[in-house]
UniProtKB/Swiss-Prot annotation:
Keywords tagged on the record: Aminoacyl-tRNA synthetase, ATP-binding, Cytoplasm, Ligase, Nucleotide-binding, Protein biosynthesis
Recorded GO MF terms: arginine-tRNA ligase activity; ATP binding
GO biological process: arginyl-tRNA aminoacylation
Protein EC: 6.1.1.19
Keyword hit for NADP: no
Domain of life: Bacteria
Subunit structure: Monomer.
Stated name of the protein: Arginine--tRNA ligase
Compartments it resides in: Cytoplasm
GO cellular component: cytoplasm
Family: Belongs to the class-I aminoacyl-tRNA synthetase family.
InterPro entries linked: aa-tRNA-synth_I_CS (IPR001412), Arg-tRNA-ligase (IPR001278), Arg-tRNA-synth_N (IPR005148), Arg-tRNA-synth_N_sf (IPR036695), ArgRS_core (IPR035684), DALR_anticod-bd (IPR008909), Rossmann-like_a/b/a_fold (IPR014729), tRNAsynth_Ia_anticodon-bd (IPR009080)
Phylogenetic lineage: Bacteria, Pseudomonadati, Pseudomonadota, Gammaproteobacteria, Pseudomonadales
Organism, scientific name: Pseudomonas aeruginosa (strain ATCC 15692 / DSM 22644 / CIP 104116 / JCM 14847 / LMG 12228 / 1C / PRS 101 / PAO1)
Amino acid sequence: MKDTIRQLIQQALDQLTADGTLPAGLTPDIQVENTKDRSHGDFASNIAMMLAKPAGMKPRDLAARLVEAIPAHEQLAKVEIAGPGFLNFFQDHVWLAASLDRALADERLGVRKAGPAQRVVIDLSSPNLAKEMHVGHLRSTIIGDAVARVLEFLGDTVIRQNHVGDWGTQFGMLLAYLEEQPVDAEAELHDLEVFYRAAKKRFDESPEFADRARELVVKLQAGDPDCLRLWTRFNEISLSHCQKVYDRLGVKLSMADVMGESAYNDDLAQVVADLTAKGLLTEDNGALCVFLEEFKNAEGNPLPVIVQKAGGGYLYATTDLAAMRYRHNVLHADRVLYFVDQRQALHFQQVFEVARRAGFVPAGMELEHMGFGTMNGADGRPFKTRDGGTVKLIDLLEEAESRAYALVKERNEQRAERGEEPFDEVQLREIGRVVGIDSVKYADLSKHRTSDYSFNFELMLSFEGNTAPYLLYACTRVASVFRKLGQGREQLGGKIVLEQPQELALAAQLAQFGDLINNVALKGVPHLLCAYLYELAGLFSSFYEHCPILTAEDPAQKDSRLRLAALTGRTLEQGLELLGLKTLERM
């Protein structure tokens, strides 16, 4: 709908330019937003206020000319001027109702991509191997997964790339420790965190051990068979730990999506050679660097992008450049999204620029760093254990499930006291599992991607507010309507007719699902979908309270309200699925 309004405004601008009301050459960014109060229309634009000065007119006078010039359209009932010159657009209720009927009949809820389908590479999760995943890996994993799901829903071909850290100093450290502990090492490997900490302690405390670790890295990189065999074993165990976390989280990542740093080893020397051939490299204290004038330090000197150390080793930038070239040459990506901590913003700005100057990627290939903030504890600092250690992600998820189970068990006892049929233990465990995992994921996804946030079990497990339990309950409330009806959602007759204010408000929200999904895909911001679903659930609650469904006054009204309820249920479920959340029929 917003795109339609933008097109209508553009047609009006073209007409006013042709008749001399507006000067030629104006290319305004036409903004169309939802109104805060639907009594003032469904959508609003400030285009008249934007162009009043170049037009030499008062905003309201220009707004009046625009209203006259905007073509009639079946989706619009009227356009009004408000305040200092806003244009308020009112949807046609008959058209709106018909569009919702079409959405209900469509398995995709009427959602289509605004633009051609693309091949999109999603770089997500990407933990360093040789130790277990910790809470710091949560955001990249679930935000990337949600955006990947949205893009697939819109028809893009999505290629997930888990760019794991499977190469480097940490493996030399582990190999050296394995030499010292040959008897117990295999057993200790099953608790990678314990094994890694022990090796890191030796590395930090013993210069001899550190030197041996570096020697083993060189042997590993040279292809030593024994080192490669042990390195492979470390990776297998580490990746199996990762897969358990992914399965627990319900994210769409598998071993087939792993494309670690080591996959690009054979191309790193060629990357350096190609940068040299392009004349982009400068030697600085023995290291090979690219200096970009756009990125300077506090003294005004260009910052280096180091691609090869003085000792011959390669860095993250070298691997990232090789990966970009692979993603263009082999994966044929139109767009690459990097879900990496926003503290790496400068790194990505630099390597993106180097890749383009070197010709590793074409100008039309989109490279986007989807940075995110930090998950903090209640004290506002990075989330840690009580003794200051990192929190294993699997431990966090287990605690979430345990807390959720205790919560739903208590509610189940209250259910029995009210004389309602209680859930059995198997059902309670499943409900607790879904509520626990969904709550952790939703609490994160509902925050703006670039914002830091404080992790709080009590808030995220609440059945009030913008939480997973609240939305899960909204889904079960819709499902209960059709259980009482004794009929499936797919068997409904009649058509939607919008009469009451609550029906209109719910319908207007449902109609915006497609625009919303496209916006999430464009910006990589799942919190917009969370906010939409939360508002939708609230509007359904108001509709449910004020507009009797099963006891409606006449059959046509009953059919209409059942259809609105059915579309609401499907939209909630589809939205939660796109976020990577499970839903429940009852809870």
